[in-house]
Swiss-Prot record:
GO terms for molecular function: ATP binding; GTP binding. It comes from Bacillus pumilus (strain SAFR-032). ATP binds at G16, M17, S18, G19, A20, G21, K22, T23. InterPro entries: P-loop_NTPase (IPR027417), RapZ-like (IPR005337), RapZ-like_N (IPR053930), RapZ_C (IPR053931). Belongs to the RapZ-like family. This is Nucleotide-binding protein BPUM_3115. Gene3D superfamilies: P-loop containing nucleotide triphosphate hydrolases. PANTHER family: RNASE ADAPTER PROTEIN RAPZ. It comes from the Bacteria. Keywords: ATP-binding, GTP-binding, Nucleotide-binding.
Length: 295
């Protein structure tokens, strides 16, 4: 039996220019708890909507990437959107990602990929064709994001700001690793010093690695000191985070520091971000991971 109400279902269709950031966008929606499908053929959209309708609360938030593959694909998508309007029980929001031609060409050169519509291999040819095909769809979009001057992180933050707000999930937990030798992070709300934990730096095989590597992670986490510390830290943060959110704070920066910001702090920052991601929107940054002492 269907228990969905129209206002309970959120369907976002992500489309736009090739190279404008649809991959980053769909990953951002996944982090927001959306059920995501990449490159769903428009001909399957009506059946997919029925599945949504019958799934009760299991598919109440869905994001679909609809890429352009040619005129036939585009015509099918427009027809599917018209059919959705006739259904009456769902109103999708269309997010159109765009960027200027110069930026799109630059991105194609960086990735060494060819534009899907460019028959001669020249990106500008495909870009011009795509703009023409997408003109009507862009006109239907409720939101148009110009990503020309946005880095992937900034696009992610923009999507979160727009779509998390409507869900009441505006509280963001930013977890940052850093090295004390490079100074304290000036934007940190909470700072935890993990220099008391056993240091993988002194094991030659792990020195060039970081806390993103499994060998280092396992080494750091195997010690009883680490396990007791993480247990107490999670208990403390589980108490504090709801209070910060209740007070109206939009984001919290938790900084985890070790000596150089390579091993222990990276491991613990990843651990915290992973632990709290089901309750909050979390984002992890490793401030000093690219810095290496030169001797």
């Amino acid at each position: 039996m269907n228990t969905h109400k129209q206002e309970d279902i959120q369907l976002v269709i992500i489309t736009g220019m090739s190279g404008a950031g649809k991959t980053v966008a769909i990953q951002s929606f996944e982090d927001l708890g959306y059920f995501c499908v990449d490159n769903l053929p428009p001909s399957l959209l009506p059946k997919f909507l029925e599945l949504m309708k019958e799934s009760n609360s299991k598919m109440s938030k869905v994001a679909l990437v609809m890429d352009l593959r040619g005129r036939e694909f585009f015509d099918s998508l427009i027809a599917a959107l018209d059919e959705m309007s006739d259904l009456g029980w769902i109103t999708p929001r269309i997010l159109f990602l765009d960027a200027n031609d110069k930026v799109l060409v630059s991105r194609y050169k960086e990735t060494r990929r060819s534009h899907p519509l460019a028959t001669t291999g020249l990106p500008l040819e495909g870009i011009a064709m795509e703009r023409d095909l997408l003109e009507e769809l862009k006109g239907r979009a409720q939101m148009i994001f110009d990503t020309s001057d946005l880095k992937p992180k900034q696009l992610r933050e923009k999507i979160v700001a727009h779509f998390a707000t409507s869900q009441g999930q505006v509280f963001t937990v930013n977890v940052m690793s850093f090295g004390f030798k490079y100074g304290l992070p000036i934007d940190a709300d909470l700072v935890f010093d993990v220099r008391f934990l056993p240091n993988p730096y002194y094991i030659e095989s792990m020195r060039p690695q970081t806390g993103n590597d499994e060998e280092v992670r396992s080494y750091v986490m195997k010690w009883s000191e680490t396990q007791k510390f993480t247990e107490k830290l999670i208990d403390l943060l589980s108490f504090m985070l709801p209070s910060y959110k209740r007070e109206g704070k939009s984001q919290l920066v938790i900084a985890i520091g070790c000596t150089g910001g390579q091993h222990r702090s990276v491991t613990l920052a990843n651990y915290l971000s992973e632990y709290f991601k089901n309750d909050y929107y979390t984002h992890v940054t490793h401030r000093d991971i690219e810095k290496r002492s030169r001797k």
